[in-house]
Amino acid sequence: MTIAAGSQDDKQRRAALWLLACLGVLAIQVLVQHLMGRLWICECGYIKLWEGVVKSSGNSQHLSDWYTPSHVIHGFLFYGLGHLLMRGKPWSARLLLATVIESAWEIAENTPMVINRYRAATISLDYFGDSILNSAMDTLAMAVGFLIASRLPVAATVAIAIVLELFTGYMVRDNLTLNVLMLVWPLDAVKAWQAGV
C-alpha cells in the first residue's frame, strides 16, 4: 500500500466517523422529542409523502410540506457558515456542525414556548408542533441542502434559494424569510397578507 492510498483510506474512515456522528445527533434529536411527548407520526394515523395544505392539522406532520424548502435553504446557509468557521476541515465535519444546529432548532421549535410564539405571531394558528417523523425529515432536508451547496457554485446556490423563497412565498404566502420575520418581529400587515385579507 502506498502512502497516498493509506492517506485516502484515513480520509474515508474519518468521513465515515463524522457521518456516523451526524446520525447520532439525529438519533438524539428523535429521542429528546420523544421524551418531550411529541407524536411519532400525524395524529391522523397515516403517513403522507407530501402535505400540501398549510392551514391544516396535517401540516408539519408528514414526510414533506411547504416548509421543506426552508430546511433545504438552512442547509445552504449552514454550508456557508461551516465554510467560514471550519476552513480546512472536511465537508463531513462541517455537516456535523450543520446537523447540530438544525437538530437544536428542531428541538427548540417543538417546545411549548416556541409553538405558542408561532401561534400568537404568525398565521400558524393550527400549529401544534412537528411530528417526530416530520422533524427528522426536516433535518434530512437540511442535509440535502448542505450537500447541494457543497457541489454547486455559490451563485447557483443563491439562485436556487431565491427561487425557492419566491415560489413558496407565491404559493402559500410563507417562506423562510417571512417565517423568521414574523417569529422575531411580527408585522400586522404581513400577517394580514398571509391570511389572505
From Swiss-Prot:
Topology with respect to the bilayer: Multi-pass membrane protein
Location in or out of the cell: Cell membrane
Chief location: membrane
Transmembrane segments annotated in the record for this chain: 16-36, 152-172
Database matches in Pfam families: DUF2585
Gene Ontology cellular-component annotations: plasma membrane
Keywords noted in UniProt: Cell membrane, Membrane, Transmembrane, Transmembrane helix
Nucleotide-binding recorded as keyword: no
Family: Belongs to the UPF0314 family.
Protein name: UPF0314 protein R03235
Organism lineage: Bacteria, Pseudomonadati, Pseudomonadota, Alphaproteobacteria, Hyphomicrobiales
